[in-house]
Amino acid sequence: MDLWQLLLTLAVAGSGNAVSGSEATPAILGRASQSLQRVNPGPGTNPSGKPQFTKCRSPELETFSCHWTEGVHHGVKNPGSIQLFYIRRSTQEWTPEWKECPDYVSAGENSCYFNSSYTSIWIPYCIKLTSNGDTVDQKCFSVEEIVQPDPPIGLNWTLLNISLTGIHADIQVRWEPPPNADVQKGWIVLEYELQYKEVNESQWKMMDPVLSTSVPVYSLRLDKEYEVRVRSRQRNSEKYGEFSEVLYVALPQMSPFACEEDFQFPWFLIIIFGIFGLTMILFLFIFSKQQRIKMLILPPVPVPKIKGIDSDLLKEGKLEEVSTILAIHDNYKPEFYNDDSWVEFIELDIDDPDEKTEGSDTDRLLSNDHEKSLNILGAKDDDSGRTSCYEPDILETDFNASDVCDGTSEVAQPQRLKGEIDLLCLDQKNQSNSPSTDTAPNTQQPGVILAKENKPRPLLISGTESTHQAAHPQLSNPSSLANIDFYAQVSDITPAGSVVLSPGQKNKAGIAPCDMPPEVVSLCQANFIMDNAYFCEADAKKCITVAPHVEAESRGEPSFNQEDIYITTESLTTVAGQPGTAERAPSSEIPVPDYTSIHIVQSPRGLVLNATALPLPDKEFLSSCGYVSTDQLNKIMP
């Protein structure tokens, strides 16, 4: 429908001016141009078989040319059969007439060339094709819209560098702009596009457009040959011109061998596997040394442990075995002298020569004059010639906790005062009966001094003598025994052969010493002043011999009725029936050593003493001394 309308419009215009080419008004030309662009907007196929515009181009924005095709229905070529007419608008008005093409030869066959005299930029043009006076095709455009530059010329390349592997190389491609384009003066601005490919490939690789006339091409293989071409376009335009001639690039072979494939060192994989391997090695090291690393970072808390003691004994509650082990080692022995601080040590005065004639060493040791001395514990004794000091080589003992604990001095004070009163009473009676006491044999008293407490404290007497030899040092001054307690009850016998003595209890048998006859008191009081004690058989014989007149009274009223007494004897009744044997007892009495060597300060007034070595008696005097109980002693005493 539009085509018929166009033909009708052209027919009306042709009838108005048939000779001059039918000058049309601008309004009619504008409508015809719009109709032509809607019908045939650009070059393409010609389905109707009539002549048609193929393209219009300006290579440098100064001239342009248009090309068309012949119709298929024209069997005979007639130079004057197809004509091109154009019209342009100047000063906002269209020219009133159509003008024919100025040059049909310069641009080639079926073309019209417009030189610079007929070319104006920024001004629209309209062209039409006529055949035998009929318009067959029409087109309107502006010169800057149809610019398609000529191909660049003078392509060449330059080698930039070769890779270290000798496989790839970089080149620089250069060219010259089209010769007819006034690029130097800036009349036209061109953009260039470079394309390259390997010779045997069909797909071109395009690079980004550039404004310069040179561009680098990277990573070309040395063993390949490449084709390079360049084309251009006006800046901000979408239509490129023709491609330049193909440039062949043949890179020199620098490597001694031809590589078929590019060798890329797998640095990334090596780094990944290296990190993974190091991590695994670190984990294996930590796993194998985890206990040692744990001890270095978090050292274990040391378990409380006593050297030489098995911890299983403490867990099982075997405290007796632990105490035995502690008693064996000198470092863990209990310090018996730390409970009461009012007696620190015993001072032996070696400067006073008069004391040598006053009595034995035991008398001076047990006297009250040196009870609170402060120094010279280890001074050399004048009589014995030995050093009286603490010797750590004490025999191994087994003390319980109850044997070590000391009672308070306040509790022991009344009992001590009572003992002093009894001893004073005994001393008075001895003085009143001096004739009888002078003839009596020397009495023997225990030589161990300890503080009297609430409960009995065992005393260990260590020495090389056997357990059947009792320690009875001789006392020349009976009045020095006023403030001492005698330990005569054996509470235990250690495996080493030492006896542990406990203090006896005074005046618990129900007999007052002051009421006894003076003869008995003077002779037997020193030996039997304590109940709960062991008594030597020889001492019992002395008492029986000296005091026969009180035998019936002693049997009628027993003086030792204390319970819980463990007394041992071999043949006490036999001795009682043989008075002759009792008479010979004093003559067979063995010498008693003095205990002047201190082993342990066990309590405030308790000492562990060593017996002074004495010459061995004859074999006939080495009979053992039997121990008798108080009940048996009462039976045999007169």
From Swiss-Prot:
One Pfam family for this entry, by name? EpoR_lig-bind
The name of this protein is Growth hormone receptor
Which sequence positions carry the modification called Phosphotyrosine?
Y487, Y595
The entry describes its oligomerization and partners as: On growth hormone (GH) binding, forms homodimers and binds JAK2 via a box 1-containing domain.
Please explain the role this protein plays, according to its UniProt record. Receptor for pituitary gland growth hormone (GH1) involved in regulating postnatal body growth. On ligand binding, couples to the JAK2/STAT5 pathway.
Which organism encodes this protein?
Ailuropoda melanoleuca (Giant panda)
**Membrane side Cytoplasmic: residue ranges:** 289-638
UniProt-listed CDD domains: FN3 (cd00063)
> Could you tell me which residues carry Phosphoserine?
S341
Q: Where is this motif: Box 1 motif?
A: 297-305
A GO CC term? Answer: external side of plasma membrane
Question: What residue intervals traverse the membrane?
Answer: 265-288
Task: Say which family it is in.
Answer: Belongs to the type I cytokine receptor family. Type 1 subfamily.
Q: Which InterPro entries match?
A: FN3_dom (IPR003961), FN3_sf (IPR036116), GHBP (IPR025871), Growth/epo_recpt_lig-bind (IPR015152), Ig-like_fold (IPR013783), Long_hematopoietin_rcpt_CS (IPR003528)
Cystine connections: C56-C66, C101-C112, C126-C140
Q: Where in the cell is it found?
A: Cell membrane
* Organism lineage: Eukaryota, Metazoa, Chordata, Craniata, Vertebrata
